[in-house]
């Protein structure tokens, strides 16, 4: 009887140790996931929203619903005849078409 009791205590101890190791692994995975989410959130805060100027940072546009906005540039001619480049973050026409098709597909198929 003492042997069974000793074996049971040993088994419970090993089980609690192994479950503690597994919980530590899960906690580490949760921390890694949280850090990556925080980094993505910081990157989002630094991005340039839609319709805002991106002349100085052409690769810093935010993400839209499906695609990242693209920096679209035009040349603006002033009354004095000088041409300056002005850029803004926007959705290119082919991305608009793809978003329209996806939205239409979601309405039809659910």
From Swiss-Prot:
Propeptide positions: 21-44
Transmembrane segments: none
A Gene Ontology term for the protein's cellular component: extracellular region
GO molecular-function term, one example from the UniProt record: toxin activity
Record Pfam families: Toxin_35
Disulfide bonds: 47-62, 54-71, 61-89, 73-87
Record keywords: Disulfide bond, Knottin, Secreted, Signal, Toxin
Tissues in which the protein is found: Expressed by the venom gland.
InterPro entries in the record: Spider_toxin_CSTX_knottin, Spider_toxin_CSTX_Knottin_CS
Main location (coarse class): secreted
Localisation: Secreted
Keyword Signal: yes
Top-level lineage group: Eukaryota
Coiled-coil residues: none
Signal peptide: 1-20
Family under the similarity heading: Belongs to the neurotoxin 19 (CSTX) family. 03 subfamily.
Swiss-Prot/TrEMBL domain comment: The presence of a 'disulfide through disulfide knot' structurally defines this protein as a knottin.
Protein name (database record): U1-lycotoxin-Ls1ll
Protein source organism: Lycosa singoriensis
């Amino acid at each position: 009887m003492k042997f069974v009791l000793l074996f049971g205590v040993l088994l419970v101890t090993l089980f609690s140790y192994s479950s503690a190791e597994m919980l530590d692994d899960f906690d580490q995975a949760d921390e890694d996931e949280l850090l990556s989410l925080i980094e993505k959130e910081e990157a989002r805060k630094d991005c340039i929203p839609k319709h805002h100027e991106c002349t100085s940072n052409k690769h810093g546009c935010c993400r839209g619903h499906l695609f990242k906005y693209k920096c679209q540039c035009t040349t603006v001619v002033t009354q004095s005849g000088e041409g300056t480049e002005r850029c803004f973050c926007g959705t290119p026409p082919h991305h608009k078409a793809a978003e329209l098709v996806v939205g239409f597909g979601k309405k039809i198929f659910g």
